[in-house]
Amino acid sequence: MASGLPTDWFREPVTFEDVALGFTPDEWGKLDLEQKSLYREVMLENYRNLVSVEHQLSKPDVVSQLEEEEELWSVERGIPQDTFSECPEAQLEPQLDPFPAGNPLMNIEVVEVLTLNQEVAVPRNAQIRALYAEDEGLSPEVLREPPQHLDKPTADPEMARQRFRGFHFEEVAGPREALAQLRELCCQWLRPEAHSKDQMLELLVLEQFLGALPEKLRLWVESQHPVDCRQAVALVEDVTWISEEETLPTQGAPGTLPPAAQQDTATWPVKALPEDPVTFLDVAVDFSTEEWGLLDPTQRTEYHDVMLETFGHLVSVGWETTLDSKQLTPQPGPPEEGPACPLKEEEGSSADDARPSTSGEALEAGAPGVWDTALKPVTLASENTLPPQPPGDSPQPQASTGPDRGRVSLQKAVPRKRLRKRDPWLKRGTRGACVKLPPKRGGAGKAVESGGDGGRRPCARNAPQITFTRIHKGSQVCRCSECGKTFRNPRYFSVHKKIHTGEKPYVCRDCGKAFVQSSSLRQHQRVHTGERPFVCHECGRTFNDRSAISQHLRTHTGAKPYPCPDCGKAFRQSSHLIRHQRTHTGERPYSCSKCGKAFTQSSHLIGHQKTHSRVKCKKK
C-alpha cells in the first residue's frame, strides 16, 4: 500500500499527544460555541480510537475535562508550562462568545488533528477546513489584538454592574468592541484581582437572589447594602411580615429608617424575644365584620386550616390552654350571632350528629358546636358584633356571650392572600396539627371512617398532641419483601413493586417501548415529538429532560456535588463518580465476550469490540 508517507513514522507507537491539537488562551477565547463543540468531539474520538486499538495510556486531564463538558482554554501539547503563569486569573475565566454560530474567528491549521478512522477523519477534517476558510481576511495577528479598554474606567463596582447588565450592542461599533467592553465592565464589577473565584460567585448569587425578591422588599434590602448572601438572608428573615399598605424605606443610611417608619416600629423586625409568653392572639389574624362577609367558602376553609395549624404549633412548643372538661362539653342554647360558616352537607354532618352524649364522643365526631365551644379561649377578636343569620341555614358556629361576645370562632375560613407573623422560636417546616388523618384500621384490616367529614377533624385541646403523635409514631410504613426498602407513601411503594415484577404498563404508541411510570413515558415521547421544553438561560441550549438541564447548569455554576471519598476529587454527575471510583477499586465490569479482556467503561468495550469485527472483515 503506497501512502507516500515515510515508513519511519510508524516505528514508534502513536501517543495521544500525536493526535491532539493545542490552543493558546487567546486562540481558545476566540472560538465560538460550534467550534468548541467540534473540537471536543474530535479530541474524544481520537482518545477512543487509541483505546480501541489496545493502546494502553492513562486518561489525560484534558479528556476528563472534555467528558465533564468543562470550558478549556488549552491543551498541554505544544504549550510550555509557564504559558499561564503570566496570565492573571481573570483572563483564565471562560467567556461566553457573543458571536453567532458559524462565523469563523480564526484560521487554524487543522492538519495536526489526526484520527485513526479514515472514514470519519476525511469528511470531518474537510468540514473543519471549510469552516475556517470562509473568511480569508482573518489572521492570527489580527485576532491576537489586545482588548480595548474603556475610555472612562468605572471605579464604582455597583455602577459597573449596572452598566454591564444594561449594555446594548448598539453602543459600540462592532462585535469585537462589544466583547471587549463587556469584559472590561465585568472585571470592574467583580474585581478579579482582589476577589477569589468563590467571592465572585457569591456576588453573582447575591445579585440573582435580590432580583428574585418582591420589589418593596428588594429595595429595602438593597438600601442596607449587604456584602454577601448570608447578610441578605438575615435581613429578609428579620422582616417577618409586611402588610400590603406599608412601604419599605428606600433611602437613608444603612440601619436607619425614615421618620414615617420610625413612628410605627411594631411592623419592623425586633430581634429580641418578647419577655411575656406568646399567646394565640399574638399570632392570630383578625377580620372585621365587613371583611369576613367578603370571604368565600374556600377562603374561610383555608382560614380555618391556618388558624388551627397555628394553634397546633403553640401546643407543640409547650403552650398550655385554659380549657377544662366543662368547656369540652357542648352547651345547649340558641345559636349566637356569628359569621356564616356552614359545614358541607355532602361531608355527612347533620344536626343530629352534632350532639353526641359525651364529650369524648363529641370530639371524635367533630360536632361543630363542641369545637366552637372548645376553641373559645383561642378565638379572634372582632370589633363589632356579627350580623344575625336567617333561620333554616346549616349548623353554624356559636359565639360566646359576655366578655367573649363579638369574637369570631375558628370555624372554616381565610383569605388566599394572607399575611402571617413568623415567630423565630417556632421550628420551621413543622407540619400543622390539623391534617387529614388516615382512616382507622379495623380488626380485619379494613378502613373505618371516623365520622361523616371524611376523616378531617377540627382540633381541640388534646387534638394537636394526638395528631403529632400519629404523624411521627403511627405512620404506616410499607416494606418491600424483595429488597427490604421501606416507603411511607403507598403510591411510591406500588411503583417500586413493578421493578421486581417487571410490569411496564405504559407503552409508547410510536415505538412500542414500555415504562414503569407514566412520567417516564411522557419524557420518552419527547424524543418522537422533538419537544425540548427546558431551556438554559445562560447559553440557550434546550433539553427534553429536567435532570439533563440540571446537570448542564452545573457547567455554568461550577458546582460539583459528588466528591470522591478516597482522593477528594469532585464530579458534576454521580455516574462520573462511580466511573472514577473504579480507578481506586480496580473494578472492570465490562468484559469482552470474544477474548475476555475487561474494561472500566462501556465505551472502551464498544471500541474494543470493533477490533474483532475489523479482523473478521480482513479474513473474508
Curated annotation (Swiss-Prot):
Functional description taken from the UniProt entry: Probable transcription repressor. Specifically binds to the 3'-end of zinc-finger coding genes and recruiting chromatin-modifying proteins such as SETDB1 and TRIM28/KAP1, leading to transcription repression. The SETDB1-TRIM28-ZNF274 complex may play a role in recruiting ATRX to the 3'-exons of zinc-finger coding genes with atypical chromatin signatures to establish or maintain/protect H3K9me3 at these transcriptionally active regions.
Entry protein name: Neurotrophin receptor-interacting factor homolog
Quaternary assembly: Interacts with SETDB1 and TRIM28/KAP1. Interacts with ATRX. Forms a complex with ATRX, SETDB1 and TRIM28.
GO molecular function, one term: chromatin binding
Keyword set, alphabetical order: Cytoplasm, DNA-binding, Metal-binding, Nucleus, Repeat, Repressor, Transcription, Transcription regulation, Zinc, Zinc-finger
Any single biological process term in GO: chromatin remodeling
KRAB domain span: 14-85, 278-351
Region spans: Disordered: 324-370, 382-458
Biased composition (Basic and acidic residues): 343-355
Chain positions of all zinc fingers (C2H2-type): 478-500, 506-528, 534-556, 562-584, 590-612
PANTHER family, per the entry: ZINC FINGER PROTEIN, ZINC FINGER PROTEIN 37 HOMOLOG
Residue span(s) of domain SCAN box: 161-243
Gene: ZNF274
Family the UniProt entry places it in: Belongs to the krueppel C2H2-type zinc-finger protein family.
Coiled coil: none
SMART domains: KRAB, SCAN, ZnF_C2H2
